[in-house]
Amino acid sequence: MNVKSIALSAVIATSFLAAGAMASEKTEPRNEVYKDKFSKQYDSWHATDESKEVVDMLEKVPSLVVLWAGYGFAKDYNAPRGHMYAVTDVTNTLRTGAPKNAEDGPMPMACWSCKSPDVPRVIEEQGEDGYFSGKWAKGGPEIVNVLGCADCHEKGSSKLRMSRPFAERAMTTLNTPFDKASRKDKQSMVCAQCHVEYYFEKTAERPGFVKFPWDMGTTVEQMEVYYDSMEFSDWTHAVSKTPMLKAQHPGYETWKLGVHGQNNVSCVDCHMPKVTNDKGRKFTDHKVGNPFDRFEETCATCHSQSKEFMVKQVEESKQKAQDLKARVETQLVKAHFEAKAAWDAGATEVEMKPILMDIRHSQWRWDYATASHGASSHAPAEVLRILGTSLDKAADARVKLAQLLGAKGVKQPIAYPDTSTKAKAQAALGMNMKTMNAEKAEFKKTLVPKWKEEAKKREATYK
């Protein structure tokens, strides 16, 4: 190449950089780019920031600390907020630790997977192998835009898409591939990219990859068999030594089991209805929320009953589930501590195995029924059924434990520690919350600002 050619190449390269790089061929993660073209949708989506309140669920239900002993949720668990807080909340939670650099911290990259349209952007740029490799902190400078347009829509379009390849594979597993689905089905499938049960693989070929456990089906029993068949556990319980499963948020699976799912009423129909603006134009309201807040556009399009009647029905279903949920939690807390007493008394692994399996199955079913949040509305009968089987499993475990403790000469009832508050429960487990909170504060003060600065510089190169 001669001098003139080299000079010309340099000019072309410089011009390209000056013009800016594309965010991604398929994904524009910056939600504000769509503000003008889709103004009504953008403004309503932005209104999800109104759910500002942080509700500490461990304060409200201290038994959760014991149920998740040894797992990150025992440190910190708040009620979910609007989509606008997805990145903020995963950054602030104690569950993601206080990493000091990109290679540090307790959690994998997969923890970002449902938080941002930057996730599909990075997957497109690096492949799934590149995206899923490494620690959660590696993604800090990359995953900065909150859940929004590109998570559910094709670039520059209102057309729906599956932006996560692991979710697309899961739909194919159910013989319902996204590209063959109706628009009505797609309106729920895009939500099912995140509002589902999933786990992080532990295989050598796909370490830390997100997978939906749907190979045998989507019911609580089918997924239980799936997990048991490969002896998978999310963690070992710090008190009972049970190989535990942590349900995420199986909203899609429980919706499918209820009257709405079985009649093809989509997530969008109830949570993102068509509304009319002040100019008389209809659009899809992207302020994802409670259907009762927009009753005339949601429930009233199918139901003839009054809002008051419908609210009462839902509240009664919710209360029944809450009452049964609390009973299960009481039994499981005691089962975990009784299992510890059995171990301390010299119980063997052979003696404990069936007991731990009962505890595992009971808590998995309890978590499946409650972690999906809206399941008592989506599938109230199924939730009560599942919680009933959970209570049975917890009772089975405690009966076996009573027999084993008696055989070991342990006086019953055993002495249970005071777990009546979040602080007392965490103290009973030996958790140093003062240190954890101080480390988290330092992380937010030192590393997070660097992430934001790196992201700002990167996005400044985009067109």
UniProtKB/Swiss-Prot annotation:
Its main location: periplasm. Coiled coil: none annotated. The keyword Metal-binding applies. It is found in: Periplasm. The gene is nrfA. PROSITE patterns: MULTIHEME_CYTC (PS51008). Ca(2+) binds at residues 197-198, 246, 248. One of its GO terms (biological process) is anaerobic electron transport chain. It is an enzyme of class 1 (oxidoreductase). Binds 1 Ca(2+) ion per monomer. Binds 5 heme c groups covalently per monomer. Substrate binds at residues 198, 249. Pathway: Nitrogen metabolism; nitrate reduction (assimilation). GO terms for cellular component: outer membrane-bounded periplasmic space. Heme c 4 binds at residues 267, 270-271, 378. GO terms for molecular function: calcium ion binding; heme binding; iron ion binding; nitrite reductase (cytochrome, ammonia-forming) activity. It comes from Shewanella frigidimarina (strain NCIMB 400). Keywords: Calcium, Electron transport, Heme, Iron, Metal-binding, Oxidoreductase, Periplasm, Signal, Transport. This is Cytochrome c-552. Belongs to the cytochrome c-552 family. Residues 1-23 form the signal peptide. It comes from the Bacteria.
